[in-house]
Amino acid sequence: SFPTRRSSDLSCKQLLMLSGIDKYYQFAKCLRDEDLRADRQPEFIQIDMEMSFVEEEDVLQVTEEMVRYAVQESLGKELGSFPRITFDEALRRYGSDKPDIRFGCELVDLTEEAEESGFNVINDADYTGAIVASEQLSRSAIDDYERVAKDVGANGLLYLQRGEDAVSGPLSKHVDTEPFIEALDLAEDETALIVAGRKRSAQEVLGHLRLKVRDDYDLTDSDNHAFVWVTDFPLFEWDEDDGWQPAHHIFTMPDEEHVDSFAESPGETLSQSYDLALNGVELGSGSIRVSDPDLQRSLLDFIGVGEEEAEEKFGFLLEAYNYGAPIHGGIALGLERICALLTGKNDIREVMAFPKNQRARNPMDGSPTEIDESVLDELGLEVRDGTS
């Protein structure tokens, strides 16, 4: 046999807190099977922190002071306190749990107007919302926005445009547009892009469209560093195949109201977790951890991890809990993401010495390379192609 990564490194940080080491801080090298986008690499560095005897407010304050100090020292900019919004508010206003708060173009909820419209495409939808572009978009531009909407899960895109004398767009042929115009506060020569569907997915589609409006019309300044805390994430998310699963990870502490009742109302249970975002990019994520063995076992059991499996995978941690665990929590921040955003770079590879390319290879030395057969023989390993 040979070792594999069975569980999160978070367990190791928790063990440090349980053993009496009340503060942990490390620039941790991470290897992860990431999809290779501009803000991701398979090898990266996290600023990793864990603290004992803390509440959520303590972690937020320590992290914020560190980031503000770093910005002051590196850029000479003095930042004020970071605003805080809840997960629900972030989706409701920005269509994202990592919102770019540098510009407006916030989502407008049109669900009530849609329900009263009599148009079955929208009046039966769980949610109908819109964003307003302060431009009279061309047909080809609207087609571009529709392609983006469909790429991220929408069935289609509706729109309304207000001209000098009339309101146009496919929706205008089926509904009384006046309630929509009033709710949108749609001015002359503006275009409203409208999405209907399941609430969260429709909000997230609008969030993507909002960022396209930002980029198309250059609504932001890269020198404006708008940090924001997002708090009160759901503890669980529903999965059609696996049922209720942790939205973050199963070691996250439920909110105080639902510590004893999360199984009865999982969809309403929030977590003591938090993310730090900058200009629409997630910089880091953290939480207050579970510190009670019975609660941890109950959470694992709720998501389908039985007692035997729990002991096999997490027995060392569950046993450590029994010796008395302090309340503890922490956060991990992506160092390269922070450096890229603070220096105005669009790709984290621009702030890395030896980044991987789009095929996850190091162009400098060609790694990773094929393993020499003699090395495999020495270790007693055999590599198969996955089809046998």
PLM regions and their residue ranges:
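Class II aminoacyl-tRNA synthetase catalytic cores and aaRS-like
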Residues: 1, 5-388
